[in-house]
Amino acid sequence: MDKVKKSDQEWRQQLTDEQYRVTRGKGTERPFTGEYYDTKEAGVYVCVCCGEPLFTSENKYDSGCGWPSFWAPMDKEKITEEIDMSHMMVRTEILCSKCDAHLGHVFDDGPQPTGQRYCVNSASLRFHSADGDAKQEDE
C-alpha cells in the first residue's frame, strides 16, 4: 500500500475544521453528535482523508457509546494500531494505514465473532451507500 503524505497546509485545505481536528490532531467528536453514529444504511465507510475503504455496514452495530462502532474492519491491514497513553489512560488508537489519519480507538468489549469494538469518529469517515450515493459530513 502506497502511503499518502501531505503537508499540514494541504490537509487543512482539503478537510473541514472538524475533520482536521479529529484526523490530523487526534481529536474526538462529542458522543451522539457525529453524522454516522446511528446510520443503518448498507454501504462502505472510507477514510475522509484518502478515500481508503475501511469498514462496512455489515460489521457495524449499535454499541450505545455514541460513535460509529464496528466489530471488525474490512481488512486488518487497512488499520494501524498504536498505544495511546493520553488522558491518563492506556488505550489502543486506530489510524488509517494509508494516510495515518486518526480514526478513534479499539476496545475489547465488542460482540462476537471478534469481541472488539472499533469506536470511530464520524468526522474521520465518508459513507458510500450500497446504492452509490456518497454522504459527507460537510454536505
Swiss-Prot record:
Enzyme Commission designation: 1.8.4.12
Domain of life: Bacteria
Coiled coil (UniProt feature): none
Binding site for Zn(2+): 47, 50, 96, 99
Active-site residues, Swiss-Prot/TrEMBL: 119 (nucleophile)
Cofactors: Zn(2+)
Keywords: Metal-binding, Oxidoreductase, Zinc
GO annotation, cellular component aspect: cytoplasm
MsrB domain: residues covered: 8-130
Gene3D superfamilies (UniProt xref): Peptide methionine sulfoxide reductase (2.170.150.20)
UniProt cofactor note: Binds 1 zinc ion per subunit. The zinc ion is important for the structural integrity of the protein.
GO-annotated molecular function: peptide-methionine (R)-S-oxide reductase activity; zinc ion binding
InterPro entries for this protein: Met_Sox_Rdtase_MsrB, Met_Sox_Rdtase_MsrB_dom, Mss4-like_sf
Catalysed reactions, semicolon-separated: L-methionyl-[protein] + [thioredoxin]-disulfide + H2O = L-methionyl-(R)-S-oxide-[protein] + [thioredoxin]-dithiol
GO biological process: protein repair; response to oxidative stress
Family: Belongs to the MsrB Met sulfoxide reductase family.
HAMAP family, per the entry: MsrB (MF_01400)
PANTHER family, sorted: METHIONINE SULFOXIDE REDUCTASE, METHIONINE-R-SULFOXIDE REDUCTASE B1
NCBIfam families: peptide-methionine (R)-S-oxide reductase MsrB
Official protein name in the record: Peptide methionine sulfoxide reductase MsrB
